[in-house]
């Protein structure tokens, strides 16, 4: 009897510790900063994208911090630490760049949104 009581107590403690660890991991994952990326591309075919230095100058003049500015094919990618910085930069660049450019938030390449979408569709098939 004492053996089963001790085993039950240990099992309860181990399950509680596991649940606490899982909750801590979920909280940690939710609090992680996810970088955001703005894309600048020309509307018309053959037009050139603005150079990174001029974009840097406009962002720096408005106190907006960024991680990197990278040209890629016909797109200029600007990475930020937060979505607030990205949104502020988008507003500044719409005001300061000449017309003829599209400034858009780049789609997240994380597997999590696709996984959640797939999970939602699978739940609808149940029952």
Swiss-Prot record:
Residue numbers on the Cytoplasmic membrane side: 1-10
Membrane topology designation: Single-pass membrane protein
Membrane topology, Periplasmic segments: 32-127
Transmembrane segments: 11-31
Xref: NCBIfam families: PRK10629.1
Quaternary structure and interacting proteins, as annotated: Interacts with EnvZ.
Name this protein carries in UniProt: Modulator protein MzrA
Organism the protein comes from: Cronobacter sakazakii (strain ATCC BAA-894)
Gene name for this UniProt entry: mzrA
């Amino acid at each position: 009897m004492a053996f089963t009581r001790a085993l039950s107590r240990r099992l309860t403690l181990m399950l509680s510790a596991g649940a606490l660890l899982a909750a801590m991991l979920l909280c940690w994952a939710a609090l992680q900063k996810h970088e955001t990326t703005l894309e600048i591309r020309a509307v018309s075919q053959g037009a050139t994208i603005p150079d990174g230095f001029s974009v840097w100058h406009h962002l720096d003049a408005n106190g907006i911090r960024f991680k990197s500015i990278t040209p890629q094919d016909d797109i200029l990618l600007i990475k930020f630490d937060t979505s607030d910085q990205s949104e502020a930069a988008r507003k500044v660049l719409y005001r300061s760049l000449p017309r003829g450019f599209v400034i858009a938030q780049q789609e997240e390449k994380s597997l999590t949104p696709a996984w959640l979408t797939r999970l939602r569709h699978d739940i609808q098939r149940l029952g």
